[in-house]
């Protein structure tokens, strides 16, 4: 088996249907499998999957186990040499997996590959490529300084590359993360203690610590309907702060300046 596509679903039945249809089309010339994990949805996601896609492996959790654990369960059932963590509110292109697989085979030391993500209206989603959110980098993001001075404060969204350039980046978004299954298992998969918005940062960073290079690959485009960039409320800011706190406590030390930066950012937001 070449590729296992892991889709974790929670109450997005219509998006899920579109997503699975697009993945099936993209896998037509690939020895691949689709694994859908449902986190105890209250809509008819599972009924739809059984009716529309009876050959797709469906795992039904009896409780909502969250993003990290749900995906870890899915990967545990995968048999592909490569895996792709894919959000259910995405639509991949027909050429997505063929192109990403070809790129992966050329880059012997790749860790995780992400692709060009756009929203439902065709706008590029900047979280497609990011840098390690050091305290200052996180501050420039949370205050919006990166928008005012993108050349000076552009590290959060890896502005050393434009959206139409392929190259090395540090952090990729959990909506689309392509990697070898062996690497996923070596680093322990997603940390199940992670807060929302830190799980993909943590996994990307673990790949780097493992001596790998992460890549943004621009030559295929994936629609992500509910991207992080579309969320602009107080709840998002609180979760972002929690995510940064978790990441720094795990990998670095949380300094006084980090706490000040985060509090200032929330005030200015």
Spell out what each predicted region is.
Residues 21-31:
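Short, acidic, metal-binding catalytic loop of nucleotide-sugar glycosyltransferases
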Residues 22, 38-47, 63:
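A conserved acidic beta->alpha catalytic loop
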Residues 60-78:
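Glycine-rich, basic loop-to-helix element that forms the pyrophosphate-binding segment
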Residues 83:
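Short aromatic/hydrophobic "clamp" motif used to bind/position activated sugar donors
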Residues 91-127:
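Conserved donor NDP-sugar-binding/catalytic core segment of glycosyltransferases
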Residues 132-169:
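Short, flexible, basic/aromatic active-site loop/helix in glycosyltransferases
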Residues 162-221:
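A short, conserved alpha-helix in the catalytic core of glycosyltransferases
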Residues 205-269:
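Active-site-adjacent helix/loop segment of glycosyltransferases
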